[in-house]
Amino acid sequence: MNTDARMGAGVSLKAEHYDQALACNLEGLWFEVHPENYMVGGPRLAWLNRIAERHPVSLHGVALSLAADAAPDQDHLQRLRALCDQIEPVLVSEHLAWSTWQGHYHPDLLPFPRSNEALQRIAENIQRCQEVLGRRISIENPSHYLQLQGHEWDEIDFLGELTRRTGCGLLLDINNVYVSAHNLGFSATAYLDRFPAQAITEVHLAGHSDDDQGSLLIDSHDAQVAEPVWALYRKLVSRVGPRPTLIERDDKLPPFTELLAERSIAQSIMTCPGVLP
C-alpha cells in the first residue's frame, strides 16, 4: 500500500466550498474530486491548483468505463494524464463499471456479469490506463441493486484477481457494501472480512437513501453516513488498520462544517477504532 503519509480523513471537494477548503488547515485533511469536472480548465482548475498546493488531492473518475466492450477512450485518457501531471494527485481511482457499449454512451455506472471474459477485458483496460497515466490506479467495489445472471466469479475473488494481474489498488466503499448486502441479501461483515486488506489504498464512507417503494437502498451520496456504515468502518479499521478515508458527498450538500464534523468522526476511528466518538 503506497499512500501519502499526510493523509488522514478527507472530504469531497465541491465548488461551493472552495474558499473554506483553501482556508482550512486541519492536519491530515485531503480532498477528492471527479477529474471530469476539471479537464477543460477554467476557474475550477485554478481553484484546484491552489488547494492542491496546501492539501493532498485525489482524483476519482467516473468516465473510463473499464468494463466496456472497448478500450478506454484515448482522448479522455490523455486529458486525465495532463490533469495528473498538473495536480500530482496522491491517488487516482475509477469505478468497476461500464458506461459505453458498442459506441453508445449511457449516463450511469452500469453492472456486468463477472465472467472470465470480463475479467480479461477489464484487466487489459486497467493496464492500459496505468501505462498511459504512468501511475497505479485503484478500482472501487460497486453498489448492486439486483442479482445479475452469468457470474463466474465471486466479487471478492474477482477484485483480488484484478489486483494480482494488474497491480492496481482497491478503493473500498463501505456504503456500497452495506447497500449491496441489503439489496442482495448477503452479510456485509463477511464481505469485509474477506476483502484483500493489502490492496486497500482508500476507503469511502457515504450516505444512502431508500427507493420510492422502500425495498431497496440507493447509493445516493446525499445524506450523512449511517450508523451501520460507521459500525462496519470501525470493524474494518480494527482489522486492517487506518487507511485514507473519504467522507463522500455529491448531492444535498451540507455546510462545510458538517462535512468536517463527519470527517472528525472518521479521524477518531482511524486513531482508536474501539472507542465510540
Curated annotation (Swiss-Prot):
The record's annotation in InterPro entries points to: MbnB/TglH/ChrH, Xyl_isomerase-like_sf
Q: Which residues cross the membrane?
A: none
Family statement drawn from the similarity comment of this UniProt entry:
Belongs to the UPF0276 family.
Per the UniProt entry, what species is this protein from, by scientific name? Pseudomonas putida (strain ATCC 47054 / DSM 6125 / CFBP 8728 / NCIMB 11950 / KT2440)
This protein's name: UPF0276 protein PP_0992
For this protein, the record's SUPFAM superfamilies field holds: Xylose isomerase-like (SSF51658)
Q: Which domain of life is it from?
A: Bacteria
Task: List the cysteine pairs that form cystine.
Answer: none
Q: What PANTHER family does the annotation carry?
A: UPF0276 PROTEIN HI_1600
**Pfam families noted in UniProt:** MbnB_TglH_ChrH
